[in-house]
Design a protein with these regions (language model features):
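Glycine- and acidic-residue-biased ligand/ion/polar-headgroup-sensing regions
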Residues: 27, 36-51, 135, 141-157, ...
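C-terminal functional regions that serve as terminal interaction/effector modules
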Residues: 148-151, 159-176, 182-200
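The feature marks the first
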Residues: 4-8, 15-50
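Hydrophobic, ordered structural segments
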Residues: 42-91
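Surface-exposed interaction/gating patches
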Residues: 6-8, 106-156
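Short acidic-glycine-tyrosine-enriched beta hairpin
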Residues: 50-70, 155-179
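A short, N-terminal "cap"/entry segment at the start of jelly-roll beta-barrel domains
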Residues: 1-17, 77, 81-123, 200
């Protein structure tokens, strides 16, 4: 579609049934109205995403469940990280959160970590975490994990992940199902989703 560019991060299945992509909308671009039979979930990384449900600035988190319908676009332009086809078939829960308007809370089990919960059920846990500069972070990864760096940076197994980096940790990533990261000099703000890869 003219005015919409994509960079695919991950795909399961030959026909894009389950895909994770970074999408850039040029100013004034719009899709035609359509239904998401298997749902969509996204984070607004830049600009303002617009659809039938509202205008969502950078920092917003949205879940449009299976059977939902909308006409997405962006008058000023935007960039989103979007996940398609990764819902339970009977999920009908909408989520629209502007994380700029809600506070984070300290994680009582991990020093140097603050959390903004976004969504949680028996299958997955989605949140934004804020990591203090230089903090050593442990993350439970049973069920798999995905991380997208919104700001700052962190190190994982010698690799530096900076803003707009994406990391996917599969099932049985490490013994004990724990990953360890080192936050960078400016700390890190990371979108995290865990527990959702058990059905792959």
């Amino acid at each position: 579609m003219a005015g919409v560019d994509r960079r695919r991060l991950d795909r399961v299945g030959a026909n894009d049934e389950r895909v994770t992509t970074v999408v850039r909308y040029a100013p004034g671009s719009h899709f035609s109205p359509h239904t998401h039979d298997t749902g969509e979930e996204f984070v607004v990384l830049d600009g303002v995403f617009q659809d039938d449900y509202g205008h969502w600035p950078a920092g917003s988190y949205v879940r449009n469940p299976p059977t939902s319908r909308h006409q997405p676009g962006s008058e000023p332009g935007c960039v989103i990280m979007v996940k398609l086809g990764q819902f339970q078939a009977d999920d009908r829960t909408f989520v629209h959160i502007d994380t700029n308007k809600i506070d984070s809370v300290p994680d009582s089990n991990r020093v140097g970590v603050w959390v903004t919960p976004l969504y949680k059920d028996q299958y997955e846990n989605v949140r934004v975490e804020y990591w203090d500069a230089g903090a050593t972070i442990e993350l439970i990864t049973d069920g798999g994990a995905e991380l997208f760096v919104l700001n700052g940076s962190f190190n994982e197994s010698g690799d530096e992940l900076v803003k707009n980096s994406w990391l996917r940790l599969p099932l049985n990533y490490k013994a004990g199902d724990k990953a360890s990261f080192q936050a960078g000099a400016d700390g890190a703000k990371v979108w995290i989703k865990t527990g959702h890869l058990t059905d792959l």
